[in-house]
Amino acid sequence: MALNPTHLLWLDMEMTGLSPESDRIIELAIVVTDADLNTVAEGPVLVVHQPDAVMDAMDSWNRGTHGKSGLIDRVKASQLSESDAEAQMLEFVKQHVSPRTSPMCGNSICQDRRFMARHMPELEAFFHYRNLDVSTLKELAKRWRPGLCDAFKKSNKHEALADIYESIDELRYYREHFIRAE
């Protein structure tokens, strides 16, 4: 497969909390789209094993959210280490884009990037230093076009693959209703 410099790598991760210093990655997924946001390839959805001590340290929001989705049980059953997950994702993305060509795409993607820089640095280094953060458009729309955000309803599943597709759909929405091509 030929590498395409215009393809975008969309990422989402679920973590045990918000601090890269004390919390860990427990799920990640990547989707490749073309520049028009059409899906080109869907990467693996990887659930990373974490020790009981890490899982037991989660706050009530994370325990409730990841318990309800079944992710806690999948993490406990997983045999996949962070380094093996990183290697699998690198193998996948290298089939679609050259290193440092695609921005990291997603919602509140800076948070994912912080975790990746700490726990999966080779994968983080594969992305361009720029981010395509859909939440930036959401924040601008809230301020400049109040009410526009209300029409796009998110399911807030907090499952990596579902969240990626929701982010892509949200960017399509903003492209149609907020960013006017002339």
From Swiss-Prot:
Q: Which GO terms describe its biological process?
A: DNA metabolic process
The primary gene name is orn
The scientific name of the source species is Thiobacillus denitrificans (strain ATCC 25259 / T1)
Sorted alphabetically, the keyword list is: Cytoplasm, Exonuclease, Hydrolase, Nuclease
Q: Which HAMAP family match?
A: Oligoribonuclease
Which EC number(s) are documented for this chain?
3.1.15.-
Q: What does this protein do?
A: 3'-to-5' exoribonuclease specific for small oligoribonucleotides.
Record-stated family:
Belongs to the oligoribonuclease family.
Q: Which domain of life is it from?
A: Bacteria
Example of a GO cellular component annotation carried by this entry: cytoplasm
Q: Which residues form the Exonuclease domain?
A: 8-171
Q: What is this protein called?
A: Oligoribonuclease
| GO terms for MF | 3'-5'-RNA exonuclease activity; nucleic acid binding
Q: What subcellular locations does the record give?
A: Cytoplasm
